[in-house]
Amino acid sequence: IAFNLYKPIQQHDRTKIIDIVSLFGYYYRNIGLVVLGGGIIVSLFIPMIFGKSDFSFGVIYFAFYSYLASSLIGYFINYRQALLSADQRNYVVAVYYQSANILKVIIQLTIAYYFANFYVWIAIELSFGILYSFILNKKIDQVYPWLKCTVAIGKSQSKNYPNILQS
């Protein structure tokens, strides 16, 4: 989909950019719903998969749903970052991601050393995923203040771009 943004970006066609990014959000929301459904189904089998684990099921479920939530953030919230990539500004994503990741690992290592608490480790993982998404989306709003995307726009544009997934 980022490929489809090159021409509208070059032509400064904001309407088309909004349409394509909204369409991307629509597709990603649908994929996210499938991933969510699959994750819920897989979670039903956790007792069979981890039946002989030394970890409590509370920790296992908390970790599973936290990582699932972190993954779903990309599908439901971060889809607009494709515009940064297509606009040759992927360095913004890299800077924010690497900075957040370094800080997260330092905090997790400190927590692991002093407290050895799995729940806190996992909560930090999820918290930084949410924080990263929030900061990245604020930056996208700053760089592209005109970018007002909605899933409704994306759904309505799916018929106007029938071949967008093939490119």
Q: What do the predicted segments below correspond to?
A:
Residues 1-11, 25, 86, 144-148:
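Helix-loop junctions and terminal segments of transmembrane helices
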Residues 1-7, 36-39, 70, 104-105, ...:
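Signature of the first transmembrane helix
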Residues 25-52, 106, 110-114, 134:
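Alpha-helical transmembrane segments of multi-pass membrane transport and lipid-handling proteins
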Residues 58, 91, 102-133:
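Membrane-interface helix-loop junctions in multi-pass transport and translocation proteins
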